[in-house]
Amino acid sequence: MSEELLSFEPATGEQLWRGKVSDVDAEVEIARRAWPEWAAKPVTFRTETLRRFADRVKAESEAFADLIARETGKPLWEARTEVESVANKVDISVKAYAERTPNRRIEGAMGLRSAVRHKPHGALAVLGPYNFPAHLPNGHIVPALIAGNSVVFKPSEKTPAVGAKLVELLHSAGVPQEVLRLVVGGPDTGKALAAHPGIDGLLFTGSARTGLALNRQFAGQPGKMLALEMGGNNPIVAWDTADIRTAAILIVQSAFLSAGQRCSNARRLIVKDSLADALIAEVRELANRLIVDHPHADPAPYMGPVIDNEAADGLTESFLVLMSNGGQVIRHMTRPVAGRPFLTPGIIDVTTMAERPDVELFGPLLQVIRVETFEAAIAEANNTAFGLSAALIGGTPQLYDQFWANARAGVINWNRPTNGASSAAPFGGVGLSGNHRPSAFYAADYCAYPVASAESDALRASIGVGLRDPEGSQLVTKKYL
């Protein structure tokens, strides 16, 4: 009997989906054979095919959102925004392909010209995460297909149903089944796909641990594209502001949206000491009011569960470790539903901790650090090996200029949350957050490579110096055409 993969709803524990584990060798071989024909299609054909995909997503938006909500546990309202992002990605990617990888031709004298064009890599593997199981892999798949690549897509083993639905919608729009392949399986299947000699590159969104392993694996293969987006230990700095209420809202959005399961969520609140008491009280009061419930509950929750009990257990343990090492609890993280991975927002002051762990705590847990000076705030913001997202709340234009110039991150915001980045801009980080292959609008860059050409419609050449004359008696300088 073939091995199977099962998927369960985080909110209820009920089985949602089951499917057979894929044969990686077979799927890669199919994609490799298919990509030359797909690449040979005009780009207008490929883009129109994907525009039909966007229409299919819109036509099935409510059912798709319901599936995302059930398999991830995120509130239905949030799942709807994810579906909207999936549909919107097509037009954004078409524009990005035209702007980031244009064909250019420069005419020269005597019929000579130079040109720059772009080619697809071939068969690309995509490894998707569970937190945005449609939007984030779609952000790799759509630009890869527009550029003329074939794709072998492995969704997270925690959200295979959404991945399968995404592929179904792409196929129904006219993307050939051979060009886009779905690989179902667990971590071993992902490792087999990443190591497969038949792929020409891998596009990854996930944890730093997995991303670092992939980086080591691909280090000896410079001919293969590797694009990594690996999360962050993101700081949000709160400075001089009289609008404590709005500042608190921005902080809560940054820390607890998606139950803290966004790579761009704030993990650390760095706050001016003289502002801290009033601001923290407002943040705690607002966090107390957040509804944590089933994704389809009425009234609608702000947060659903985290992805599974293993994740919830790890976050609870991390909160206890921070407490035992000197952290002062501002708001306890609790498990309100026995046996299910619901977590209430946790807030803890770690200012006096001698050594704070530099890890991505992927859930609704916010650490508070008090500082005296703005220079200390920037130093604390940069006190991490990650570098994805950072935000300044309050301050002045001059302070923001200082923050922007010195904060080490790929996304730097002012008076906006750390999360909710626009797909019309690049999205990526430095350090342990990525390998300088930003996604979103810049995904086009890693889906094709540039080819420079010198061209002439007719044979035209000369050797101007260093030739003997035909009799071999002397050197001549005249040109032989």
UniProtKB/Swiss-Prot annotation:
Keywords: Arginine metabolism, NAD, Oxidoreductase. InterPro entries: Ald_DH/histidinol_DH, Ald_DH_C, Ald_DH_CS_CYS, Ald_DH_CS_GLU, Ald_DH_N, Aldehyde_DH_dom, SuccinylGlu_semiald_DH_AstD. The active site is at E229, C263. It is an enzyme of class 1 (oxidoreductase). One of its GO terms (biological process) is arginine catabolic process to succinate. It comes from the Bacteria. SUPFAM superfamilies: ALDH-like. The keyword Oxidoreductase applies. Gene3D superfamilies: Aldehyde Dehydrogenase, Chain A, domain 1, Aldehyde Dehydrogenase, Chain A, domain 2. Pfam families: Aldedh. Pathway: Amino-acid degradation; L-arginine degradation via AST pathway; L-glutamate and succinate from L-arginine: step 4/5. NAD(+) binds at G206, S207, A208, R209, T210, G211. One of its GO terms (molecular function) is succinylglutamate-semialdehyde dehydrogenase activity. Its EC number is 1.2.1.71. It catalyses: N-succinyl-L-glutamate 5-semialdehyde + NAD(+) + H2O = N-succinyl-L-glutamate + NADH + 2 H(+). Belongs to the aldehyde dehydrogenase family. AstD subfamily. NCBIfam families: arg_catab_astD (TIGR03240), PRK09457.1 (NF006992). Catalyzes the NAD-dependent reduction of succinylglutamate semialdehyde into succinylglutamate. This is N-succinylglutamate 5-semialdehyde dehydrogenase. It comes from Sphingopyxis alaskensis (strain DSM 13593 / LMG 18877 / RB2256).
